[in-house]
Amino acid sequence: CTVGELDLGVLSPLAEVAPSFMREELLRVQDVQERDSATILDGLQDTAGERGPALYVHGYYIGFDKGCRRAALLQQNANLAGRFLWFSWPSDGAAAYYTHDEADLYWSVPDLADSIIELERRFGAEAVDVIGHSLGARGVVLALYEVANRRPDIRLGHVALLAPDMDFEIFARMLPRIEPIADSMTVYVASGDKPLALSKQVHGYARLGESGNDVSRILGVEVIDLSDLPNDSPTGHLYHIYSPAVGRDLQQLLNEGKRASERSGLVAQGSN
């Protein structure tokens, strides 16, 4: 899909000083083209460079149109142009249909696993990065678990889980199976994340993307706590598309392959 900014004419100066979280409302999907996977991957091979593709999976309450706009914002914020690939699963796109979206996500996990395996086959070992936000991060973990069972020899690049809406304890149990198939695994967490706080109430257990979990139990995973950053969105859940600091950190991780100890702007607070 092709996304562009609205032409606001005389109101353009107001748009320039609007809060960062308003940027999404200034974007519109201009064009959607259907292409076969071979054509898409051929084009990606020409533009991705040495790093290979970065596959992004969106979260809950994200219909196709909103997904296009959010994907465009993440691509821009993390400087992933040329290597960005968006996996769109059939979210109902309605706030009241959270459990419907959970079912839709689970239905899509085998296809996501197939996509990851095909990308690694096409681009090679450690060349494919995988990014998941919110409920989409849960889908990434479940897909990686399936990939590890089907292809224990596979080797991916960096896995980044942004505000993951997943049970912390379930992730800890699945980690030993999925951690060996990725070059690195990074989880971004924050306090004040309202959707994750609500998800905790719904499920009864702490979410992986909330700060305050005993992260020493998930050794091998680098945990980036963003709680001290300014809140760039009303919900505290969309820092990956609205926070320039998070965008810079993702660029250093995904484009430059730097571990947390090598990236600027981070302060070590524990072993992981």
Where are the regions a protein language model picked out?
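Lipolytic serine-hydrolase domain surface
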Residues: C1-A48, C68-A72, Q76-A127, L144-H158, ...
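Short beta-strand element of the alpha/beta-hydrolase
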Residues: R51-G59
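Short His-Asn-centered micro-motif
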Residues: V57-H58, H133, L162-P164
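Flexible, glycine/proline-enriched loop segments at strand-loop-helix junctions
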Residues: G59-Y61, E102
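Short substrate-entry loop that stabilizes the transition state in hydrolases
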Residues: I62-G67
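Gly/Ala-rich beta-loop-alpha elbow adjacent to hydrolase catalytic centers
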Residues: L112, G132-G136, V140
